[in-house]
Curated annotation (Swiss-Prot):
Catalytic activity of the protein: dihydroxyacetone phosphate = methylglyoxal + phosphate
Task performed by this protein: Catalyzes the formation of methylglyoxal from dihydroxyacetone phosphate.
Domain of life (superkingdom): Bacteria
Gene3D superfamilies, alphabetized: Methylglyoxal synthase-like domain (3.40.50.1380)
Keywords: Lyase
Pfam families recorded: MGS
Protein name: Methylglyoxal synthase
Residues that span the membrane, as ranges: none
Length: 154
């Protein structure tokens, strides 16, 4: 697939997601990095979003719960350029009924070349990177070229 350059803005749109056994860990991480996160727009799936807003006082736009489609809502926002960073504390020891949704979400994040953190250490690296406060040019799929090529064959 052809690619093109796409910019991540200096003020990032950050999605925050956590499986049930990781919600407190994510909340603790958000509290630790509240000052940095205040500089960005925050989004979260259902229960995680309510917990983070209540425990941190941060403004968090909430989607529906992950198992009910929230992971897919976040994925759709990634594919339309409305989410720039994904911080997803998932539980590697607990099988989830919506594992296919999780796999799809991580795939979309990889396709659209956005930073992904899956634990406190990787999230620390992302949030403390100088790039988090800067515009950043990355390679993304050239959807227009893709459609032009596909429709040529019709």
């Amino acid at each position: 697939m052809k690619s093109r350059t796409g910019a991540l803005p200096s003020r990032k749109q950050i999605a925050l997601i956590a499986h049930d056994n990781k919600k407190q860990e994510l909340s603790d991480w958000v509290c630790t990095h509240k000052k940095e996160l205040e500089q960005h727009d925050l989004f979260a799936t259902g229960t995680t979003g309510y917990k983070l807003a209540a425990e941190t006082g941060l403004k968090v736009e909430k989607y529906i719960s992950g198992p009910l489609g929230g992971d897919q809502q976040i994925g759709a926002k990634i594919s339309t350029g409305e989410i720039d960073v994904l911080i997803f504390f998932w539980d590697p020891f607990e099988p989830m009924p919506h594992d296919p949704d999780v796999k799809a979400l991580l795939r979309i994040a990889a396709v659209w070349n956005i930073p992904v953190a899956c634990n406190p250490a990787s999230a620390d690296f992302v949030i403390t990177s100088p790039l988090i406060k800067q515009s950043y040019e990355r390679q993304i799929p050239d959807y227009e070229a893709y459609i032009a090529e596909r429709t040529k064959k019709l």
